[in-house]
Every structure is written in structure tokens, then in C-alpha cells.
A protein has these predicted regions:
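Residue-level signal for pocket-adjacent positions within structured domains
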Residues: 35, 78, 112, 116
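Short, contiguous alpha-helical
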Residues: 2, 7, 17-32, 38-81, ...
């Protein structure tokens, strides 16, 4: 590895942590905390997921693709159960569970090296590199965060205020650092 390879790897991992843990997760949490348990578990139709199911699904995905894989642990994910939750788990239980997984994911991302990003893994039966796994989690989390934001806006009829710092031109009035827990 060259110094440039290490720098690119460090930039990729830093950006991934900031996006996942400093932006998507806090905003998703804000959305969910604004909903009632009934809203979290409501589905507009049988083909759609509830926010509760999406939270269980994100927990399973982040745990499988980051925590379990990079720690070389046995994968015990039961993906179908994420969409068939039989009971209305309280919002606090859902958020605590995902928060625990996100803290573990943060620890994993903080210690990864360029060698880890290039190393081979098998996830969901697919041969991938560590880089693939990190990218998949950030992209996948962003997709479902967007769905949850949309559902929250639809149910509440309110602007979530995530971009209130932007001017009319879409630019920040001042630079704001995104903190990673």
C-alpha cells in the first residue's frame, strides 16, 4: 500500500462514518421519535413495510454487513423475520436495538484499515471486498432513511427541518461540522 492508498482509505472510511453515523442515523432517529407506536407499525398496504419493520431490517443489515463480517463472527441474521415482526415492539426498544448496533458499527469503521477494505468476505452468500460491505451499508441505510423520512412527513404533514441551515441558493450560510458519536 502506498501513502496515497492509505489516505484514500482513511477518507472513504471517515466519509462513510460521517454519513452513516453523523447524518443518516441522527435524522432517522429524530423521525422515529416523532411517531407514535401505532404510526411506527402502520402499513399503507400489504406490499409496503412499516417504519418498525424498516428499523429491524436496518439493524439486521448493519449488523450482518459490518459488525458480524468484519469481526469474522458467525452470521445469525434471520432476514425474513425483520419483515414479519409479530408484535408491536415499543419505539424505545427498536431505537435502543439499532443504537447498539450503530455504536458497534462505529467501532468497526473506526478501526478498519486499507487492508480490511481489500480483504475478501462472504456476505449473504456473495463474495465481496470490505469496501463493498461498507459502501453497501451506507447506501442501503440512506435508502431506508429516505423512506422513513418520507413516511414521517406523510404522517405528520411537517417539514423535518433537516436542511434549515441552507440559504435559498441551497448553500450553507456557514460551515457546519458533522459530528460522529
Amino acid at each position: 500500500m502506498t501513502a496515497n492508498d492509505r489516505e484514500v482509505s482513511a477518507l472513504f472510511l471517515d466519509f462513510s462514518r460521517r454519513k452513516l453515523l453523523g447524518q443518516y442515523w441522527p435524522r432517522l432517529r429524530k423521525c422515529v421519535e416523532s411517531l407514535t407506536v401505532e404510526q411506527v407499525w402502520s402499513r399503507p398496504n400489504a406490499a409496503s413495510n412499516s417504519v418498525g419493520n424498516l428499523l429491524l431490517h436496518l439493524d439486521g443489515n448493519v449488523r450482518q454487513w459490518l459488525v458480524t463480517s468484519f469481526n469474522r463472527q458467525e452470521d445469525r441474521r434471520d432476514r425474513p423475520s425483520e419483515f414479519d415482526a409479530p408484535e408491536l415492539l415499543p419505539v424505545s426498544v427498536l431505537l435502543d436495538r439499532l443504537d447498539r448496533t450503530m455504536r458497534e458499527a462505529s467501532d468497526v469503521l473506526a478501526r478498519l484499515t486499507e487492508a480490511d477494505l481489500l480483504a475478501p468476505y462472504e456476505i449473504q452468500g456473495y463474495p465481496v471486498r470490505g469496501l463493498d460491505a461498507v459502501y453497501q451499508v451506507v447506501e442501503h441505510f440512506g435508502l431506508h432513511y429516505g423512506q422513513i423520512s418520507y413516511i414521517t412527513k406523510t404522517l405528520s404533514g411537517k417539514d423535518l427541518g433537516f436542511y434549515s441551515e441552507l440559504s435559498k441558493t441551497g448553500r450553507r450560510e456557514e460551515q457546519v461540522a458533522v459530528r460522529v458519536p
